[in-house]
């Protein structure tokens, strides 16, 4: 039995942070992919939040951008509060 993995709001948020970091350093998706050993399609999926970033991959990304892992989660509490408010209003 295979489990379908769905992206969470946190995955989407972390992916958006990845995109911000990548663009701020001027790297293309392809260049970043080469540096961390994945395809550019995988970077696209990370940035959209459709694929989760595992701990070891997150560590590799931190090395590329010279940031601590917490950088990817800065502001997530506020983002989640907005998402919760939005979903309870539906």
Q: What do the predicted segments below correspond to?
A:
Residues 18, 32-33, 43-46, 72:
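Conserved hydrophobic/aromatic packing and binding residues within compact polymer-binding modules
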Residues 36-53:
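Recognition helix of helix-turn-helix/homeodomain-like DNA-binding domains
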Residues 50-63:
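Short, basic-rich loop-to-helix N-cap that marks the start of a DNA-contacting helix
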